[in-house]
């Protein structure tokens, strides 16, 4: 049962694969409950009765919500039976989706455990994109920008690097280049034809807040006055907007966006651009 103070609850995530799907779904839902925090217990690669028995022991010792992605029917049955026995809720995250697919497609699944993580072309595409994005982070190796799918530009602390890595995890080769007043942009940026160039923008207020937090975490507030000076930051933002207008870069406001939301917006811009080029 949930603790009487209601400050936290146990969340058991049982998977026959990596558990990434469970983690993503459960965190998205848990974020809607600000007054309680889940204590995550993640059990990946559960593929035998012996492994499941160890999981069930831990669940019984710390009762809570049980979410699972298991394909083996015997394992599913044993897990559900145990949860019912000790009176705790359990739910298959992938089961209802598979039933919907099966009803619509009129065929059964292959039952391959971890099929989404096989070493296929998509996997190697992600690895290639990650390698590219790490090499072309923060304005490095600009001679290779034409090989990117997306080039992110923006002033400091507009989430260029984390967004680049997120996109790379989706198989999108992403470079990022900082925009700094008084420093000329790489000439390669002026002549790009293949990549989509997206200019990330945030309000001066947001940039100052993020930068102050950054400096405090580094213990480096002295000597960085211009970095958080209101007029200097205003000038940076204006400089970036002028460049975006001059070169026709797509402009994306990120002030109130998470990394995931920013990446999703970039992917939509990329898809729209690709569709227009095909028409």
UniProtKB/Swiss-Prot annotation:
Keyword Transmembrane helix annotated: no
Residues reported in the UniProt entry to bind ADP: 154-161
One Pfam family per UniProt: Kinase-PPPase
A GO MF term: phosphotransferase activity, phosphate group as acceptor
Keywords: Kinase, Nucleotide-binding, Serine/threonine-protein kinase, Transferase
Catalytic function, reaction form: N(tele)-phospho-L-histidyl/L-threonyl-[pyruvate, phosphate dikinase] + ADP = N(tele)-phospho-L-histidyl/O-phospho-L-threonyl-[pyruvate, phosphate dikinase] + AMP + H(+); N(tele)-phospho-L-histidyl/O-phospho-L-threonyl-[pyruvate, phosphate dikinase] + phosphate + H(+) = N(tele)-phospho-L-histidyl/L-threonyl-[pyruvate, phosphate dikinase] + diphosphate
InterPro entries: Kinase-pyrophosphorylase, PPDK_reg
Stated role: Bifunctional serine/threonine kinase and phosphorylase involved in the regulation of the pyruvate, phosphate dikinase (PPDK) by catalyzing its phosphorylation/dephosphorylation.
Protein known as: Putative pyruvate, phosphate dikinase regulatory protein
């Amino acid at each position: 049962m949930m603790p009487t103070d209601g400050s936290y609850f146990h969340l058991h995530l049982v998977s026959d694969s990596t558990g990434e799907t469970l983690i993503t779904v459960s965190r998205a839902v848990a974020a809607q409950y600000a007054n309680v925090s889940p204590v995550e217990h993640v059990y990946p690669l559960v593929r035998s009765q012996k492994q499941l028995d160890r999981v069930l022991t831990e669940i019984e010792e710390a009762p809570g919500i049980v979410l699972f992605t298991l394909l083996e029917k015997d394992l599913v049955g044993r897990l559900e039976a145990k949860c019912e026995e000790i009176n705790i809720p359990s739910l298959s995250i992938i089961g209802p989706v598979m039933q919907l697919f099966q009803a619509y497609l009129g065929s059964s699944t292959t039952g391959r455990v971890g099929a989404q993580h096989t070493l296929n072309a998509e996997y190697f595409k992600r690895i290639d994109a990650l390698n590219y994005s790490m090499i072309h982070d923060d304005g490095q190796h600009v001679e290779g920008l034409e090989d990117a799918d997306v080039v992110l530009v923006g002033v400091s602390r507009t989430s260029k690097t984390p967004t680049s890595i997120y996109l790379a995890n989706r198989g999108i080769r992403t470079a990022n280049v900082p925009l700094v007043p008084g420093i000329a942009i790489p000439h390669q940026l002026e002549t790009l034809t293949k990549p989509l160039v997206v200019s990330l923008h945030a309000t001066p207020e947001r940039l100052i807040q993020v930068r102050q937090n950054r400096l405090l975490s580094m213990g480096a507030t002295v000597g960085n006055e211009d970095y958080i000076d209101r007029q200097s930051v205003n000038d940076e933002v204006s400089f970036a907007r002028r460049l975006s207008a001059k070169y026709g870069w797509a402009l994306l406001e990120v002030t109130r966006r998470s990394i995931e939301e920013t990446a999703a917006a970039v992917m939509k811009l990329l898809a729209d651009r690709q569709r227009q080029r095909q028409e």
